[in-house]
């Protein structure tokens, strides 16, 4: 039996990138952290470090489609980031529809009774967890 390969999910924004990684069995998503975006080179280097550290073989990147399913300006920025990242890593990359994941993450954090200041610090990581858990649930159904 082939061992499970870890999956890394990214919630890519203009200022930050939230990250989550799958457990070794591929059932659950755990939040890692959020990095502050600097330069494309620094962002890619940060991704390479996490990919190596967690032995990631697959990347799932949230694609923020418009509510009608079309690709808007923010999704184009994410695709541009993916195209910059693709030649630098050996992982398969999957785009995953992330509509409403930030809202879902925020609702969960509010229900957990976290103050606004704390929510603001972890919302991107929580959104990455939602993206990855949705993808894992899809794979495991």
Model-inferred region functions:
Residues 2-8, 15-141:
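Phosphate- and other anionic-substrate recognition elements at nucleic-acid/protein interfaces
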